[in-house]
Amino acid sequence: MSSAGNKGSDAEQCAAAFLQQQKLTLLEKNYRCRFGEIDLIMREDDTVVFVEVRMRSSDRFGGAAASITAAKQSRLIRTARHYLAGHEGDFPCRFDAVLISGNRENEIEWIRNAFDES
């Protein structure tokens, strides 16, 4: 039986592989700073893509998408700004979500521009 940490890591691995099949390039996994953590940082053409990966075994509490709250979005935005501040250049960026429904044979839903900085 997998622990919650292993399931999260498995979901991130699955999401990274899926996005790489979509021609995105993996830059970093589990980027951490004092503001929070970003599961995956990818690049699509010249755009830096910050990816939140969510796995839910049921939709009982709104499913994976509902778990990305306004507070979580705020932490992701601050963490992304920290990441960008450490890299030279002015890169366009966006925030995507990859939702994995464990109760449907790992059905993957990729939401581009899941939220913005406003």
Swiss-Prot record:
Residues annotated as signal peptide: none
Matching Pfam families: UPF0102
A GO molecular-function descriptor: nucleic acid binding
Alphabetical list of InterPro entries matching this protein: Restrct_endonuc-II-like, tRNA_endonuc-like_dom_sf, UPF0102_YraN-like
Taxonomic superkingdom: Bacteria
NCBIfam families, per the entry: PRK12497.1-3, YraN family protein
Family: Belongs to the UPF0102 family.
Protein name: UPF0102 protein NE0719
Organism listed in the record: Nitrosomonas europaea (strain ATCC 19718 / CIP 103999 / KCTC 2705 / NBRC 14298)
